[in-house]
């Protein structure tokens, strides 16, 4: 079984790629909101989410409410906490385990994210997940899609090749070992100095 595992992962990656492609093939009818929609995509556990909050508040300054509507697409596990915070206008919960299935749930959620009509989609997670955050970046259909270049702890070369092509920008990362708080600050610094704001 160990011999076949790398090949099974490749097959699985392509199957998800095809499933998502078909789900997003149907013409969408995205909302046309008066404010530019900015998606913040985080699918990680509550510990990483809580550590990110110190940086999260800075996104309100980068994308002020008179011009932008911030929607957090987040893990359902911390939805109740996130919706009480003033850093975003809406929280869009994702049931992570169910999302990583070939299901009506995944199909519908991809369509809902596409229909938000986002202009900007941002995934600040350092260790990106092909089936989760990267798939949601792709589904957003945003003109500007930004993630951390990150590491490959959750991705093989095929997943990295496919997912990187779904982005317009990848924020470079230091090769030095950094804490989660330092990684969050590093990403935001790279994003906020971007010429595309």
Q: Which residue stretches match the model-derived regions?
A:
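Catalytic machinery of carbohydrate-active enzymes
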Residues: 1-197
């Amino acid at each position: 079984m160990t011999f076949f595992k790398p090949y099974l992962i490749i097959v699985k990656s392509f199957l998800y790629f095809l499933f998502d492609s078909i789900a997003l093939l149907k013409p969408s009818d995205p909302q046309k909101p008066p404010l530019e929609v900015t998606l913040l995509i985080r699918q990680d556990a509550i510990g990483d989410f809580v550590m990110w909050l110190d940086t999260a508040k800075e996104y309100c300054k980068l994308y002020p409410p008179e011009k932008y509507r911030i929607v957090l697409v987040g893990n359902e596990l911390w939805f109740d906490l996130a919706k009480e915070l003033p850093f975003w206008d809406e929280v869009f919960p994702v049931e992570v385990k169910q999302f990583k299935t070939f299901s009506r749930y995944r199909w519908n959620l991809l369509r809902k994210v596409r229909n938000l009509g986002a202009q900007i989609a941002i995934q600040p997670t350092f260790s990106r997940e092909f089936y989760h955050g990267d798939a949601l970046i792709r589904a957003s259909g945003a003109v500007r899609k930004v993630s951390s270049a990150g590491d490959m702890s959750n991705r093989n070369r095929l997943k990295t090749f496919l997912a990187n092509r779904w982005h317009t920008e990848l924020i470079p990362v230091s090769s030095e070992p950094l804490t989660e708080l330092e990684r969050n600050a590093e990403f935001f610094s790279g994003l906020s100095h971007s010429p595309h704001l």
